[in-house]
Amino acid sequence: MNTNEYQNRNQPNTGLSRRTMLGLSAVAATGMLLVPGALASPGMRRVVVWSEGTASKDEGSKEVYPQDINTAVAEGLKPLAGWEIITATLDDPDQGVGEERLQGTDVLIWWGHKRHGDVKRELVDRINKRVREEGMGFIALHSSHFAEPFKKLMGTQCSWGEYVADGTSAQIIVKEPNHPICKGVKDFSLPKIERYGEPFKVPTPEAVPLDGIYTKPNGDTKPGRMGLCWTVGKGRVFYFTPGHETYNDFFRPEVRLILCNAVEWAAPKA
């Protein structure tokens, strides 16, 4: 898979950080691959990046994510050393996360939007068990606050107070610089973001490493939480607010670094 294809077509002109470039070089040296459907290699940890498969088909998003959001997220995880990165979609066999694959997964990243109700209850229950009883990490992105696995883990409605896509911009603020998810991350701006307004109906998080300030088109500002963490049973859960399908958030170096850090943080600890 040609990483430059994504950088040239979709990334903002900020360039990759030195850390990311070094990580990508290490990937090339070690031969770690982005695999659409294999079992984990011995001695490697596994992260599965799941999406429902609509972003590459819908008008307004297919130009941004022509190979879908899961591929963009997975490309951004390549600097992770010792990880096998697998993409999966709702339309794959077993909805992308069969029992054998799930049992070998250390962290599951989830992006859903329109097809939350199509995810089978049995899969939701298996994911819930893997997190609560066996310590698998779970990362929910943007509209996945309504994903059935995330709602099952939270045990609440998981709704935001408002949803507005009106040209709002956002400043992402590192609130807890010593949190592992914030390692190497500096405050940054997103020129456009779908505004998710408080309150967010979830359990009180144990940490909010990333905060934010929304700036509306009229100049008014509103605070909003951008990254929230929980421990659910034996597992760790992270929710990341940005990631609307018509914006190129998942090609931004800052977002990719956050997600790399989140995978390491959420992974089961020996």
Segments from the language model and where they lie:
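Catalytic beta-strand/loop cores that center a nucleophilic Ser/Cys/Thr
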Residues: P42, E84, W160-Y239
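N-terminal export leaders
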Residues: L16-M32
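Aromatic-Pro/Gly-enriched surface loop or interdomain linker
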Residues: G37-G104
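N-terminal secretory signal peptides
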Residues: M1-L16
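Extracellular ligand-binding/catalytic regions of CAZymes and related secreted enzymes
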Residues: T89, P217-G224, V232-A270
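Short alpha-beta junction capping motif
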Residues: W50, R101-P149, K234
